[in-house]
Swiss-Prot record:
Broad class of enzyme this protein falls into: ligase
Catalysed reactions, semicolon-separated: XMP + L-glutamine + ATP + H2O = GMP + L-glutamate + AMP + diphosphate + 2 H(+)
Keywords linked to the UniProt accession: ATP-binding, Glutamine amidotransferase, GMP biosynthesis, Ligase, Nucleotide-binding, Purine biosynthesis
Biological role: Catalyzes the synthesis of GMP from XMP.
Record CDD domains: GATase1_GMP_Synthase, GMP_synthase_C
Domain of life: Bacteria
Protein name as annotated: GMP synthase [glutamine-hydrolyzing]
Listed PROSITE patterns: GATASE_TYPE_1, GMPS_ATP_PPASE
Entry-linked Pfam families: GATase, GMP_synt_C, NAD_synthase
Active-site annotation: C97 (nucleophile), H185, E187
Subunit and partners: Homodimer.
Length: 539
């Protein structure tokens, strides 16, 4: 991925201006989920690779450290090791699963295979109600285990605070050094008191206040935006989704009428969406300026003959930026006679934390796919980027949007990718295929809304397998139509997702309507893949 060089005026990261819990990722499947759970406790948190040198971690002056799980055995050669310096720095530490075992291993405890593995829901045999992590909790708890090794002897100075049949030392603590650990995964919903355990560590063990709130985020971000943009002007790409709407609202609060929002109609939106966006913008940003740009022919021409998904994302990202550069020139030209006009220097984008992670923006992170507003930017971009949501998860963005007073229809709008239907057509993007997919998508959205499932699912991409034809029977003859794929998922932040269990009667209505009302489609299939291993979007 091409990384754009930071500008000298780029504001300091949030971790530099507020107490931050760093989650050290030892290869956990759900390291991002740990960070989310910490933020749910109103404490700011970020994820860093466990391979980060201890000195570099401590330079950031973390308020606390949480050590994630991981697939390795601490005693095997080449396994990730915990630097004892992190345990000697006086920073509160909580180890989870592998992180728990790494604490024991580093401080002289014993980690071994006991012959009893624990996977899934497990009942704690004993809990010390006087311990920091379990104070004022039910003594009977069900937790989510996933381990073959176990701590059989705690390090010197540690009190054992919980145990199970397969883990004689399932939790321990050293109050004096403020080091704690549990063998299970409190971050997952299957651990009945998991969030309470994390909150006990954060608020009691580490002594952190609950200061990470939507109102606090707004105040901090508005100040940072003013610091970054100064007296210059900005334009914001408005898509109609919650991300760009909240980003625009934050920037508008910071710089007022020096922000112009631009909506690029690239022809890849869903049925009736452009008109909805114009109306919603008026409700959310009354009096603000919105420039509508019709670039449908330009995008469709650029995508002609292109089938590779990464190539499509790159093309859409580049055309998007070029369209903005033209809009910038027009805005500047209009204000030439205004003596108070200043340079239009910044491009506001609704980039989120998961976008950055999936695009390889984190140190040591693998590039899963290029997001059009992160890794899809051209090298010679003429703007400086302002990304006020870059450190937020989706649920936090919604909370900020609600706090800002945005319409509910925007705040709770289901996610829709920037490249639009262009990455939901598997194959070349043509006008005929877009029209076909729009109709199928409209049917799905209408039926899910009628069934009251809007808030129960995260999103439901409808995918057209444009390069595939299947044999069908309609009336008295054979048909050779395209399949469409329904991809309903449940999620909290898009980092992980499960396929949504849509009621059979709803699926039946959707299938019947699509195959009867959409010419060229004769088969509807359901994608039942979780994330991981599959991403939410097919491309």
């Amino acid at each position: 991925m091409t990384q754009n060089a930071p500008h000298p005026d780029t504001p300091a990261p949030l971790s530099d201006v507020m107490p931050t819990v760093l989650v050290l990722d030892f290869g956990a499947q759900y390291a991002q989920l740990i960070a989310r759970r910490v933020r749910e406790a109103n404490v700011y948190s970020e994820v860093v690779p466990a391979s980060t040198p201890a000195a570099q971690i401590l330079e950031r002056e973390p308020a606390a450290l949480i050590l994630s799980g991981g697939p390795s055995s601490v005693y095997e050669p080449g396994a990730p090791q915990l630097d004892p310096a992190l345990l000697e720095a006086g920073v509160p530490v909580l180890g989870l699963c592998y992180g728990f075992q790494s604490i024991a291993h580093a401080l002289g405890g014993t980690v071994a295979q006991t012959g009893t593995r624990e996977y899934g829901s497990t009942r704690l045999d004993s809990v010390d109600a006087d311990s920091v992590l379990f104070a004022d909790q039910d003594l009977e708890q069900v937790v989510w285990m996933s381990h073959g090794d176990a701590v059989t002897q705690a390090p010197e100075g540690f009190a054992v605070t919980a145990s199970t049949a397969g883990a004689p030392v399932a939790a321990f603590e050293d109050r004096e050094r403020r080091i704690y650990g549990v063998q299970w995964h409190p971050e997952v919903g299957h651990s009945s008191r998991g969030q309470r355990v994390l909150e006990q560590f954060l608020h009691e063990g580490a002594g952190l206040g609950a200061d990470w709130t939507a109102s606090g985020v707004i105040e901090e971000q508005v100040e940072r935006i003013r610091e970054q943009i100064g007296d210059k002007r900005a334009i914001c790409g408005l898509s109609g989704g919650v991300d760009s709407a909240v980003a625009a609202a934050l920037v508008q609060r910071a710089i007022g009428d020096r922000l112009t929002c631009v909506y690029v109609d690239h022809g890849l939106m869903r049925e009736g969406e452009s008109a909805e966006i114009e109306q919603a913008f008026g409700e959310a940003h009354g009096g603000a300026r919105l420039v509508m740009v019709d670039a449908r022919e330009d995008f469709l021409s650029a995508l002609a003959g292109v089938t590779d998904p990464e190539a499509k994302r790159k093309i859409i990202g580049e055309r998007f930026i070029r369209t903005f550069e033209k809009a910038q020139a027009d805005i500047v030209l209009e204000s030439e006679h205004d003596p108070d006009a200043t340079e239009v220097r910044f491009l506001v984008q609704g980039t989120l934390y998961p976008d950055v992670v999936e695009s390889g923006g984190g140190d040591g992170a693998a590039n899963i796919k290029s997001h059009h507003n992160v890794g899809g930017l051209p090298d010679d971009i003429e703007f400086e980027l302002c990304e006020p949501l870059r450190e937020l998860f989706k649920d936090e963005v919604r909370a900020v949007g609600a706090e800002l007073g945005l319409p509910e229809g925007i705040v709770h709008r289901q996610p829709f990718p920037g490249p639009g239907l262009g990455i939901r057509i598997i194959g070349e993007v043509t006008q005929e295929r877009l029209d076909l997919l729009r109709r199928a998508d409209a049917i799905v959205r209408a039926e899910l809304t009628a069934a009251g499932l809007d808030r129960q699912i995260w999103q439901c991409p409808v995918v057209l397998l444009a390069d595939v034809r299947s044999v069908g029977v309609q009336g008295d003859g054979r048909t050779y139509g395209h399949p469409v794929v329904l991809r309903p998922v449940t999620s909290e932040d898009a980092m992980t997702a499960d396929w949504a269990r849509i009621p059979d009667d709803v699926l039946s209505r959707i299938s019947n309507r699509i195959t009867n009302e959409v010419d060229g489609v004769n088969r509807v299939v359901l994608d039942v893949t979780s994330k991981p291993p599959g991403t939410i979007e097919w491309e």
